[in-house]
Amino acid sequence: MKIIKGINDKNKNDIVKWTNEKGKDFLEQWAGKNADFPLTVSQIDNMNNIYSIFCENEFIGIIQKIRKELDNIHIGRFLINPELTGKGLGKRALLEFINLIFQEKDVNSITLNVFDYNVGAKKLYEKVGFRVVNVAKNPMKKYMMIMKKGEK
């Protein structure tokens, strides 16, 4: 598993294809409420700090460092090729990304949000060590989860 900052044009087109084939709900599930369907390359261009995920040199997805607040990094927009889910690749990619982030000396925690209906993603996050710290109910129920450096 390899994670590299940035995304090339071919891989942007893969993200657009995977997403638009799955539909509007799938886009919202990984990109949030502010993404417009159908997804376009220009929307991906507007996402800062995107990282490409590769498995055996094959592009399989993306993940984003959304923002840094003090000693915390908030992550999101985590997407694995839908044809490859259920094979443990998401877990491996997420663990690799967590390791990459925690190598930064001034980072002590990672947070993310996950919609209530995205049960599989929430289970994955809990499996790798995230825990729920807050629940927001408006406009849709979502969980804020955290992982602290050194915790599991």
Regions found by a protein language model. Give the residues of each.
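Acetyl-CoA-dependent GNAT
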Residues: 2-83, 100, 104, 136
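Conserved active-site alpha-helix within GNAT-family acetyltransferase domains
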Residues: 91, 116-134
